[in-house]
């Protein structure tokens, strides 16, 4: 559309903004709202208004776990989601839309929530995604043959290869060491005033999106594995 418009994209990420931050790889994101940074409405609206004046449009990405300065989620509905007491989230983009429209910056604001799309879009994965997830499963399967391998999970540790490039290794540890723990997006990689992420962050992300797996299609539609409850 050629009319003035703000587009707000919501990604998964309750307590960490890795997914939201990775969208900056496209080079199209104007403003980024992460859980790691206390949300300040006045600063955010000021930046949206500035972008609209400069270019007539504004592309905002927000993590579902974005919080006010007092720790309250933008989108929490007050109900527990699971046994760990996590609040049910979803709707951060809608909240931002309401704030932007109510501030009179634009008459129209479009929202897109990626939660289910991100979970099911196997055609959008990178070759690195595919190979690492397969190898991770194999690693867990081989370890499970040992009786002592119980109550544990297998994870991926990032490192460097002999050539200094991207490399990973798999490791096992007790599930209790990881359950309900969060690895936040590094604060030193976050630019001020919602302006995105640093070049160091982009360098970290780039190896993860390399390669395009060959899709298996039937009648033009990517073939997917049916959920167990629908077989």
Regions found by a protein language model. Give the residues of each.
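Accessory alpha-helical/coil subdomains and C-terminal extensions
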Residues: 1-110
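C-terminal non-catalytic interaction/assembly regions of soluble proteins
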Residues: 77-231
